[in-house]
Amino acid sequence: MNQERVVKAGLLGLGTVGSGVYKLVECQKDEMAMKAGAGLKIQKILVHNMNKKREGVDQSLLTDKWEDIMNDDEIEIVIEVMGGIEPARTMILEALHAGKNVVTANKDLVATHGHELLEAAEESGVDFLFEAAVAGAIPIIRPLKQCLAANEIQEVIGIVNGTTNFILTKLIEEGMDFDDALALATELGYAEADPTADIEGLDAGRKVAIMASIAFHSRVTFDDVYTEGITKITAKDVEYAEEFGDVIKLLGVAHNTEEGIEVAVHPMMIPKEHPLASVRDSFNAVFVRSDAAGDTMFYGRGAGELPTASAIMGDVIDVIRDIQYHCTGRISCTCYRETPVKNFKEVKNKFYIRMLVDNKPGVLAAIASVFGVHKVSIARVIQNTKEDDAAELVIVTEAVKEKHLEDALAHLVDMDTTREIGTVIREY
């Protein structure tokens, strides 16, 4: 190792995460050099607006031309924190083909084009690392790829979106309604101005696709992931979950079964004794079940300037070590299997269904008959009388295929005695 050597990097983007990376490099420069075996220098920073004032940043490093980084032979590492698919994909591919190592936090890109980028890195014998793309400061990619490599992983279940976990925590602990909790999340900076990707499960879906690909050694893309958000969860559902001894979480779920990979994001009622049930506020956690190691869980900050920068710099230090030992590209794509992803309609789940019906004789029997016709077994029923001759029914099913439950609900909607199908939530 040569601590006097300085490895030079190009930084693509100087927003929240990019600024965190720059701060860490400047503040931890000497310590990182000791850990990595060589120093690190940010040689150039690609920005969109050269005229924007940036406190604490050496303005001479800024450029708005990708070619200034791409054509600089001294730059050995490209750190991409711009986000989005393009132009990030094109830039990363060009960098990899030119023999530059790449570290990214871009979940959208990895979930959609990860296989292509890993193959390009393998062909060029360079590193393409993306620990920060899934759960911020939480190490999960490296454990799945390396630490648990001797295991057959059966399931990966995670709370991988801090915004929705914060909102659900407020619903559960403070009795807030969804809109007020979302407004608070926005005020505190947890939610974006357009929160759709968070509250509809899209952000978590991209992260689950990445984890499933690595855990099960097979290609899973975001298009394979069923996604459902938390916008329909009400205080009433939280109360029933409490009555059942459960809490409601937005979970990314990936199972490796004999019939194929099951992968989805949706709200789920989980028992309070499950490790994920106690994950509060904006924290993230990933629960992994495997044959040899058993149950393991990884917990921490899932987003933010410095937590994400921490994961990025962990990858950068790994790349510097690989450069020192001339072993870049040593961990290539591990998707050597061709396991199919199951059609989500064929996946089995237990369900909680809350509905409003006419309160008169024979209605419950008719509903039970409809469920029977569609192969849905009922585990329990709770009935509460409401005003206007209505009854609120809560039905919990045994494990049933998604398509059978969907057909049964469609049948119930057409019945004259059904006033409303309220919330449908899966149970762990």
Predicted regions and their residues:
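N-terminal glycine-/serine-/threonine-rich beta1-alpha1-beta2 phosphate-ribose binding loop
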Residues: 1-97
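General beta-strand structural signal in soluble alpha/beta enzymes
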Residues: 62-63, 79-80, 103-105, 128-132, ...
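Rossmann-fold NAD(P)-binding glycine/threonine-rich loop
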Residues: 88-98, 107-145
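Rossmann-like NAD(P)H-binding beta-loop-alpha module
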Residues: 122-203, 210
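Catalytic, metal-anchored helix/loop core of enzyme active sites in primary metabolism
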Residues: 153-157, 165-168, 172, 184, ...
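Substrate-binding/catalytic subdomain of NAD(P)-dependent oxidoreductase enzymes
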Residues: 180-278, 283-285
